[in-house]
Amino acid sequence: MAGEISSAGVAIYYASETTLNTCPSTGFKQKATGGQLNIADYITGISGLGADYDMYDVTPLSETVRHRFIKGLQNNDGSIELNANINPTSRADWDAIVDEFAALTDGKSLWFEFVLPGDTDGFFVRAEPLPMRFPDVEAGSAVQGAVQLVENKCKGFDTKITA
């Protein structure tokens, strides 16, 4: 097939809302204020973004063979997990993003943009970054764990905004 792309070079940006519940059109950055690394420099994997639909059973009592369903609300359980290499630098940089979120007022949040290599669109979500947890640790392996975003709005694919 033609057109396949590699995950090498995925970029992750974020920006603070200036208008409540509205994706910013400027100000997206890859690095936390005062941070040393771009977010994508320590993220090793991204859980699927977007949501499935709940399915509601509307089977009438008279039905004797099959259930009937209708499409319900979108649902992703509200959680986006980013697998990360965890070390003092990545931890400090992620903490800086969490602190930027905590400093927002009037219910404003952060928007995250995920851009695939060569794509003209980014995938946008409004989300709250949670503090980094202590990772699972095993002998003979890299220290990796999840950093988590609590998604509260998904814009989906739209023209990328990279600065």
Task: Specify the residue positions occupied by each region the protein language model found.
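Short, acidic/charged, Gly/Pro-enriched secondary-structure junctions
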Residues: R91-R126
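Viral virion structural and adsorption modules
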Residues: M1-I5, C154-A163
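Solvent-exposed edge beta-strands and adjacent loop segments
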Residues: A2-N83, E128-A142
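Short beta-strand and beta-hairpin "edge-sheet" elements
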Residues: E113-D158
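Acidic glycine-/aspartate-rich tracts in secreted/extracellular proteins
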Residues: I86-T89, C154
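Extracellular structured ligand-interaction cores
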Residues: D77-S79, S109-W111, Q144-A146
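Short intrinsically disordered coil segments
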Residues: A96-A102, Q144-Q148, T162-A163
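Hydrophobic side chains in beta-strands
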Residues: Y14-A15, A84, F114, E151
